[in-house]
């Protein structure tokens, strides 16, 4: 085992003790909160840098042990499908464009999810945008996004879909090396 992987396992063991008595939802919220001030980096999902969907996928991995790495749109369409989530469900807020638009180098189509923010408290989300992620009030974010022609939807996680995708080892598009190390450390900790 290399030194970096050992450090990762030791860190995860310490975190495991902290979250030991928490539910999966509480762990998800905890790990989202711990990700405040991560550097924003497109295509990343690790403990030093992440993009919006990467932060949600990493929180899911740390909270549930289930590994997926997908876009915000795929999270919305495949995994966060509960339209009326219970307060104890793992939840995320999705920002859906009302028309075709270009953001950076990517063109998003009408009704495609352009952004996701994991809910880590009542009306509190981890908003992972440049230059770094921060905890924000969803109520404070809504007027800006609505004025810029986005629809905001909060959905709950379909835990069975997440488990099946993880068990089948699907939906891991382009997971970065650090995400894989975390996944391997979690799998190693399980035995």
Q: PLM features: residue spans?
A:
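...with weaker cross-activation on analogous glycine-rich loops/strands in unrelated enzymes
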Residues: 2-12, 24-26, 64-153, 157-162, ...
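Secreted/periplasmic proteins that engage bacterial cell-wall peptidoglycan
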Residues: 13-78
């Amino acid at each position: 085992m290399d030194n970096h992987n050992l450090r990762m396992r030791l860190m995860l063991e310490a975190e495991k003790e902290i979250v030991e008595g928490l539910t999966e939802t509480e762990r998800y919220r905890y790990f989202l909160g711990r990700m405040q001030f991560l550097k924003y980096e497109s295509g990343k999902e690790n403990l030093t840098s992440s993009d919006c969907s990467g932060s949600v996928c990493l929180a899911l991995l740390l909270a549930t042990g289930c590994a997926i790495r997908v876009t915000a749109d795929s999270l919305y369409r495949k995994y966060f499908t509960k339209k009326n989530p219970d307060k104890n469900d793992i939840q995320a807020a999705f920002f859906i464009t009302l028309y075709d638009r270009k953001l950076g180098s990517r063109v998003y189509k009408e009704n495609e999810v352009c952004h996701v923010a994991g809910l880590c408290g009542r009306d509190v989300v981890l908003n992972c945008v440049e230059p770094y992620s921060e905890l924000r009030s969803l109520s404070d974010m809504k007027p800006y996004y609505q004025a810029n022609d986005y629809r905001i939807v909060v959905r709950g996680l379909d835990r069975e879909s997440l488990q099946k995708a993880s068990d089948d080892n699907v939906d891991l598009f382009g997971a970065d090396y650090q995400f894989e190390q975390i996944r391997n450390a979690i799998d190693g900790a399980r035995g």
